[in-house]
Design a protein with these regions (language model features):
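Extended, H/D-rich, highly charged conserved domains that either
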Residues: 171, 200-201
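A cytosolic small-molecule/anion-sensing beta-strand core signal
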Residues: 181
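Nucleotide/phosphate-binding catalytic cleft detector across ATP-hydrolyzing
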Residues: 1-167, 184-199, 219, 223-318
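A structural feature that tracks compact, well-ordered secondary-structure segments
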Residues: 176-178
Length: 318
């Protein structure tokens, strides 16, 4: 079985064919050191990799950080991929996987394949993982693709070669921007910032939550950001009601900073005829990008499901 995986720092996004159907799965990344306790019917996911013990935990404030580029080659990345496979509904078996690297890692300074990083990623994902009292998948082959670029394949196929698409992929940790010619005849330019992503917002909001007596995991912080306009949700999940206003201000201010930095990057690109915005951070920045690029509406695209846009492209490439 061949499985297409966008192994981002915040979530693992998967797509595969099964029983004649295309299926998808999203698995948040949230791991801590040590094993979780067993109780009742609940089954903890307790893993061992490189002789170290880890467990999956969505709520602990002690979860290990994933918002750095070295995560791409870390034991946590391997665990995240295996955990997504194990929670996908697929029976453990031998699989081939297609994964991604941020543009700044996939390409070198001359915009050529960084073969050392690509091989490093492959070797990392081939490491053995064990699950306490359970079976795991055997990864028999790893293919590595760049982020951003594959997501534009559907749009580029319908454009003539004289046109070009600016593909803006904002993830949890990285911003990947590529300029691709119609029909995928050329990749004109790539840019990757490994320190610019939604985690900029997550970090600042987490600090505001700590001041509101609400220590929690990055997953729960991200859920607060997503539900920032839902007063009932905020009241239910922030321990100090008097601090809700401060948390909302922190969310708004950090999103504004994120938008400004993304627009600074986009301003350096010229000559594109179409724009496509993808990635988990797309809902936070798409409107600002639309206004900034001032391109006609029928040439500006936000993926219907921004988180899954890249795996759709990976599957289309094969």
């Amino acid at each position: 079985m061949r499985i297409f995986i966008d192994d981002g720092s915040t979530n693992i996004k998967m797509m595969w064919e099964q029983d004649g159907e295309t299926r998808t799965h999203i698995s948040p990344n949230s791991f801590k050191r040590g094993w979780s306790a067993t109780f009742g019917a609940g089954k903890p996911f307790n893993y061992v990799i490189d002789d170290e013990k880890y467990s999956y935990d969505l709520i602990s404030p002690d979860v290990l950080p994933t918002n750095n580029v070295e995560w791409q080659y870390s034991p946590l990345n391997v665990l995240a991929v295996h955990h997504a496979l194990l929670t996908s509904g697929i029976e453990p078996q031998e699989v081939e996987i297609v994964v991604t690297l941020p543009l700044a890692e996939f390409y070198d300074d001359d915009a050529q394949y960084n073969l050392a990083n690509i091989e490093r990623k492959k070797a990392s994902l081939m490491r053995p993982v064990t699950l306490n009292k359970g079976n795991v998948f055997t990864i028999k082959k790893v293919t590595v693709r760049p982020e951003s670029i594959p997501a534009g394949i559907g749009l580029c196929d319908n454009l003539n070669p004289a046109h070009s698409v600016l593909i803006v992929d904002l993830g949890g940790t990285t911003l990947d921007v590529s300029m691709v010619a119609g029909q995928m005849t050329a990749v004109s330019r790539v840019f990757g910032d490994s320190n610019l992503g939604v985690s900029l917002v997550t970090r600042e909001v987490r600090q505001a939550l700590a001041r509101a007596n609400t220590e929690t995991s990055n997953y729960n912080v991200d859920q607060l950001i997503i539900n920032r306009h839902d007063e009932d949700y905020l009241n239910d999940n922030i321990n100090d009601p008097s601090a809700i206003g401060d948390v909302k201000k922190a969310i708004a201010a950090s999103i504004d900073r994120l938008r400004t930095r993304v627009l600074d990057v986009i301003s350096d690109f010229k000559g594109y005829t179409h724009v496509m915005v993808i990635g988990g951070g797309a809902p936070l920045v798409a409107d600002a990008i639309r206004e900034h690029v001032n391109i006609r509406d029928d040439r500006f695209f936000v993926a219907d499901d921004p988180q899954l846009a890249l795996v759709h492209g990976l599957k289309a490439i094969g």
